[in-house]
């Protein structure tokens, strides 16, 4: 078991403790655990650190010494995902309100029924209980045109994890179904939904390994985890807030608003005092 900070992974690619070279434990990727595809890393370790630094600097109120790279642990990891293809379809009942065109003091309420369908292809969802689903979702999208047929050579130098959530497990399918049915609902309904009868069917489920740089740092006794898309560089993770910066911003904002109000008022008083 290896990991980044407290982030533990069931590895199928690991490292020699003596020379640091990569060693692939092939038997862990046999049978149903053998991926269909792999998406290779295109973002280097240094690039990932640059993405992390920019992510911190672009955010407001982050303590200046939080993103000191001396405190960062980083590891390139192939995360197990499944790509789901299929169709969502069904019927929705909705209603929306609109100000009456004949009497602006009245509200017209419209009810209606809509039916529709939507095909979807290669919707990603991680299949690891150890990975935070929201964090993995937040670093999408990935370019699936760059997928390669799985080969152990791509794992060299990286950690990798085999899936521990069944690709057709009911909760996993519901997660994807909810996502697609929400998209269909947005396409069909204006206003609120009063009832819905939607369902999703799956025509293909592909097992792939996705490139993610996992970063971990400790700050004031708390551990912070970040993920960098190993293909695009998209970076996400929770950032701490420096109280001093927040209060400084509040002070400057208060002074600015006060100046906007007080200065015109001052000149108005001067002008009124000069009126005979």
Predicted feature locations:
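Short Cys/His-rich micro-motifs in 6-15 aa windows
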Residues: 20-28
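Residues immediately within or flanking Cys/His clusters that coordinate Zn2+
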Residues: 13
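Extended hydrophobic
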Residues: 206-257
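Surface loops and adjacent helix of pleckstrin homology
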Residues: 10, 28, 238-240
């Amino acid at each position: 078991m290896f990991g980044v900070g407290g982030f533990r992974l069931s590895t199928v690619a690991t490292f020699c403790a003596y020379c640091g070279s990569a060693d692939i434990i092939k038997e862990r990727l046999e049978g149903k655990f053998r991926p269909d595809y792999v998406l290779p890393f295109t973002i280097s370790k240094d690039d990932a650190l640059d993405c992390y630094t920019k992510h911190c600097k672009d955010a407001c109120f982050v303590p200046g010494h939080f993103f000191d790279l001396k405190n960062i642990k980083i590891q390139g990891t192939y995360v197990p995902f499944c790509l789901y293809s299929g169709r969502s379809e069904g019927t929705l009942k909705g209603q929306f309100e609109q100000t009456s065109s004949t009497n602006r003091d009245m509200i017209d309420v419209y009810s209606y029924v809509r039916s529709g369908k939507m095909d979807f292809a290669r919707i990603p969802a991680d299949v690891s209980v150890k990975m935070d689903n929201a964090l993995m979702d937040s670093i999408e999208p990935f370019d699936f045109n760059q997928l390669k047929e799985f080969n152990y050579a791509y794992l060299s130098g990286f950690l990798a994890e085999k899936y521990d959530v069944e690709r057709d497990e009911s909760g996993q399918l519901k997660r994807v179904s909810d996502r697609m049915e929400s998209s269909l609902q947005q396409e069909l309904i204006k206003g609120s939904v009063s009832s819905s009868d939607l369902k999703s069917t799956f025509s293909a489920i592909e097992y792939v390994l996705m490139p993610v740089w996992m970063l971990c740092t400790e700050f004031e006794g708390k551990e912070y985890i970040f993920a960098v898309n190993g293909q695009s560089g998209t970076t996400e993770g929770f950032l701490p807030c420096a109280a001093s910066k927040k209060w400084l911003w509040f002070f400057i904002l208060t002074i600015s608003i006060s100046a906007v109000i007080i200065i015109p008022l001052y000149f108005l008083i001067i002008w009124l005092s000069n009126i005979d």
